Amino acid sequence: MATKRSVGTLGEADLKGKKVFVRADLNVPLDDAQKITDDTRIRASIPTIKYLLEKGAKVILASHLGRPKGVTPKFSLKPLVARLSELLGLEVVMAPDCIGEEVEKLAAALPDGGVLLLENVRFYKEEEKNDPEFAKKLASVADLYVNDAFGTAHRAHASTEGVTKFLRPSVAGFLMQKELDYLVGAVANPKKPFAAIVGGSKVSSKIGVIESLLAKVDILILGGGMIFTFYKAQGLAVGKSLVEEDKLELATSLIETAKSKGVKLLLPTDVVVADKFAADAESKIVPATAIPDGWMGLDVGPDSIKTFAEALDTTKTVIWNGPMGVFEFEKFAAGTDAIAKQLAELTGKGVTTIIGGGDSVAAVEKAGLADKMSHISTGGGASLELLEGKPLPGVLALDEA
C-alpha cells in the first residue's frame, strides 16, 4: 500500500477556521448504567483532535458504537461527551443526529477550536452500505477529512470511504499513521530475525495471516486451540481438544510450506489439559504426544514456554496475534502471560514488538504490560487483514503522500 498523507502535513494555513470531519473509533464498552468501562479508544483519538484544535480548526467528530439496528438509545454516543470534554479540556457539543438540519445548524455555529460530536453513524443502515447520498450528507458540513479509525479501515462504509469522494484533502490521523507505519512496515521491511506468534482457537480464522507471514518470517510460533488441528494432522491423539476436521490437509500443507521456505515452525511440545472447559477444571501437564482420552488441551505447557522463549531471544521483530491458551481462566493463562512478559522484556532490549489486535491486546492489558510494547494495534479485523496483505478500503481512499 502506498504511503498516505498524514494530518501532520497540514498547518495552520490549511486548518484555521476550517471544518474538519474526523472519523474516529470511539467504539468503547459501556456497562448497563451507560458508564465507560475502558476509555482506551477515546484516549487514542485525542492527539489528532488536539492537533487540529491547536491549529484553529473546527472538529466534527464521527464514530460508530456497537452494532445497532436503526436508532438504538443504548448505542448512543452521549455517554462519551463528558470523558471527551475532560480529556480535551473544553465543552464538546453533542449533536442529536449525524446528518440533517439540526446538525448543519450546530456545525455552522461551531467556533474555531470547537468540537461537535455527531450521533452514532450506524443508526443509519446507509452507513454500512456506503450509500453515496448518505456520505454526501455527512460530508456536507465539513471542508476536509481525517480518518483516525484504523479499527474500521477494513470496511468500506460511508464515514470511512464514501465521504472521501466529497472532501479534500482526505488524510490519515496520527493513530492511523502509527498503525500503518508499524503494521505495514513490519510486514514490508522488518528487522531480522523476524518472528510471528499466532494463537487463537481456530486455524480457519488465521489461515490468511499464517500463509502471508510464512512468506516473510524466520520463526513462526503457534499456540492456542488451533494447535490440535496440527497435532491431529500429524497423527497424534488429541483427546477432547478442539479440532477442525476440514482443515487437517491445510495444516499439513502449512507445515510443508514452512519447511520449504526454511521457516522455523514451533508447535508446543507439552500442553496443559483439563477434564472440562471450566475455570475450576482438573488440570495436568502432559507431552503433546500423550494427550489422554477424554481430556482437552487449554494452554501450552512449561517446556513449550521455555522453547518459545529461547527462539524469541534471537529476534529483532516480533508480531503477536492470538493467545496461547484460554487466558480468561486463570488456570490456563500461564502460556499467554509468559509471552506477554517476555515481549515486554525484549522491547526493553530494543526489539520491535507489535501486538496485532484482538485477544492478545486484552492479554497484554490484563498483565499490565501494554505500555511496555513497541506498538499495540487498536484494530482487530483490520490488523489481521493488513497482516494478510489485503488492501484496506478506508486507507486506499486517503490522499497519497
From Swiss-Prot:
It is found in: Cytoplasm. CDP binds at G200, G224, G322, F327. Gene3D superfamilies: Phosphoglycerate kinase, N-terminal domain (3.40.50.1260). Mg(2+) binds at D359. Pathway: Carbohydrate degradation; glycolysis; pyruvate from D-glyceraldehyde 3-phosphate: step 2/5. (2R)-3-phosphoglycerate binds at A24, D25, N27, R41, S63, H64, G66, R67, R122, H154, R155. The keyword Transferase applies. One of its GO terms (cellular component) is cytosol. GO terms for biological process: gluconeogenesis; glycolytic process. ATP binds at K206, G225, G297, E328, D359, S360. Its cofactor is Mg(2+). InterPro entries: Phosphoglycerate_kinase (IPR001576), Phosphoglycerate_kinase_CS (IPR015911), Phosphoglycerate_kinase_N (IPR015824), Phosphoglycerate_kinase_sf (IPR036043). Pfam families: PGK. It catalyses: (2R)-3-phosphoglycerate + ATP = (2R)-3-phospho-glyceroyl phosphate + ADP. AMP binds at K202, K206, G225, G297, E328. ADP binds at G200, G224, F327. Its EC number is 2.7.2.3. Keywords: ATP-binding, Cytoplasm, Glycolysis, Kinase, Magnesium, Metal-binding, Nucleotide-binding, Transferase. GO terms for molecular function: ADP binding; ATP binding; metal ion binding; phosphoglycerate kinase activity. The keyword Repeat does not apply. Signal peptide: none annotated. Its main location: cytoplasm. Monomer. Belongs to the phosphoglycerate kinase family. This is Phosphoglycerate kinase, cytosolic. The lineage of its organism: Eukaryota, Viridiplantae, Streptophyta, Embryophyta, Tracheophyta.
